[in-house]
Amino acid sequence: MQMRHVIAELHYIADGHLDHRIKFEVNTELQKVVSSINALVDSTVNSMEEERRIEQSKDELITNVSHDIRTPLTSIIGYLGLIEDHQYRSEAELLKYTHTAYLKAKQMKVLVEDLFEYTKVKSTTTKLNPVRFNMIAMLEQLAASFELEAHKKHMRILVSGEPNPLMMEADTEKLGRVFNNLIVNALKYGQGGRHIFLDAQRIGSEVVVKVSNDGAQIPNDALSQLFDRFYRVEESRSQETGGTGLGLAIAQSIIALHGGYIYAD
């Protein structure tokens, strides 16, 4: 009798009632089977929900990429069309059209490169190549590489930390991409700031690196979304500062690969 009830319950679940579970008590041996069935259904439902989430995420990714590629591509086609139809009044205007098309093409190239990097670091097969290095020395090298760009914006990049040397193991190429993205953001969006601070400290078994500036603060309602792919703080949407919206998502994925965490406050 108990087995018939279990079979009937299984048929009910198999008919699509995946929120149903076998709840009645049976003898000890059969109870193990019932528990296993319930666990299997739970696992199946969770897998299906995860698959739906992944598919939705892929659809959103395609939509966002299509939009971000279409915008500069439309401009390129428009300006090249004007050139093709000889709709320019002077050589200066011709150069202006070609230069604008060139800048839009570069914008598309950056998006494609960032998208490739994002999908690469999100892959479960991505491997790290860890080496032992001095974190403070790495930050000093990064600061030096951005010195000219910072000078143009009347900013200085200051490095601090202890102990020095602060030795650790990580994939320096990927980690360099993280700090590169953070410094670029600090330069782009730190309106009114004069300094970018790079600080590294060993706290217990962790190395904590803080990138900050003394410019305009990020709105509180944007903090929780900063690391979402394609998210841009609305106030920063402009031709001058608009990036791909993938930089911080890439940074988060790289840090996660290292078993670490990243946040903004």
List each model region and its residues.
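HAMP signal relay modules and closely related sensory coiled-coil linkers
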Residues: 2-12, 21-39
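Conserved catalytic submotifs in the C-terminal HATPase_c
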Residues: 129-132, 151, 156-166
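A conserved beta-strand-to-alpha-helix junction within the catalytic ATP-binding
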Residues: 129-144
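Short conserved segment of the HATPase_c
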Residues: 218-232
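Short beta-strand/loop element within the Bergerat-fold HATPase_c
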Residues: 193-205
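Short helix-loop "hinge" at the ATP-lid/N-box region of the Bergerat-fold HATPase_c
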Residues: 186-187
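Conserved glycine-rich
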Residues: 259-260
